[in-house]
Swiss-Prot record:
GO biological process, one term: tRNA wobble uridine modification
Catalysed transformations (reactions): prephenate + S-adenosyl-L-methionine = carboxy-S-adenosyl-L-methionine + 3-phenylpyruvate + H2O
InterPro entries, alphabetized: CmoA, Methyltransf_25, SAM-dependent_MTases_sf
UniProt name for this protein: Carboxy-S-adenosyl-L-methionine synthase
Pfam families in the cross-refs: Methyltransf_25
Source superkingdom: Bacteria
Top-level class of the enzyme under EC nomenclature: transferase
Name of encoding gene: cmoA
Length: 242
């Protein structure tokens, strides 16, 4: 059972950059459910997409796996033989808790939980790759290289599932969607102080792209098609097919 997220509930004199440390890992399920609109729907549908695209004797990658929600959703849906899921995160605290979550369930599909920098991990013989609210935390210069590596490591017909927070070119629309997201957080019990302090902590480490930028990047890398399959306010998920 997850603890309640109250990390930003008291005034903080000097707000540092947001990190996925032990404190965040402890409350992460509560934090993400109350902060990301449609998160449960995305996790469920990642499993459905995996069921459609996983091929026998292929690899599945969950890059930036946090506590393994997407990994577990995929493992529940995979019916193919000879598949391995590689769940990778660079946070020691997340990896340790992810291992506990994965080991709590039996399955014919093995999962390897690995502490590593996803920019340095080899992607090979993959039918499914997931980046679930991960790419936005990489520096813009690293994003293209990672996506290029994923494309190279995917089998023809393989799928990349990319969930992200978005920015929008139209300034008034962008501001409205930001405001609606903050309303969502308030409706889920976060105070004005928590909303404000979390935004200050995360704005320097999370730099989202527009949907247009994502689609142009996919096309340039060589994916055959891409589309948004889910969106709620300024959060959503896309697929890109090799």
């Amino acid at each position: 059972m997850s603890n309640t997220d109250n990390i930003f509930s008291a005034p903080i004199d000097k707000i540092g950059d947001f990190t996925f440390d032990a404190r965040v890992a402890e409350v992460f399920p509560d934090m993400i459910q109350r902060s990301v609109p449609g998160y449960s729907n995305i996790i469920s549908a990642i499993g459905m997409l995996a069921e459609r695209f996983v091929k026998p004797h292929s690899n599945i990658y969950d890059l930036g796996c946090s506590l393994g929600a997407a990994t577990l959703s995929m493992r529940r849906h995979i019916q193919q033989e000879g598949c391995t899921i590689f769940a990778i995160d660079n946070s020691e605290a997340m990896v340790e808790r992810c291992k506990l979550h994965v080991n709590a369930y039996r399955s014919d599909t093995p999962v390897e939980v690995i502490e590593a920098d996803i920019r340095e991990v080899e992607i090979k013989d993959a039918s499914v790759v997931v980046l679930n609210f991960t790419l936005q935390f990489l520096s813009p210069d690293d994003r293209y290289a990672l996506l290029e590596k994923i494309h190279a490591g995917l089998r023809p017909g393989g799928i990349l599932i990319l969930s992200e927070k978005y920015v929008f070119e139209d300034e008034s629309s962008n501001e409205l969607l930001i405001d609606l997201h903050h309303d969502f957080k308030r409706a889920n019990g976060y105070s004005e102080l928590e909303v404000s302090q979390k935004r200050s902590a995360i704005e320097n480490v999370m730099r989202p792209d527009s949907i247009t930028v994502h689609k142009q990047r996919f096309e340039k890398i060589g994916f055959s098609s891409s589309e948004v399959w889910f969106q709620c306010f300024n959060f959503g998920s896309m697929f890109a097919i090799k």
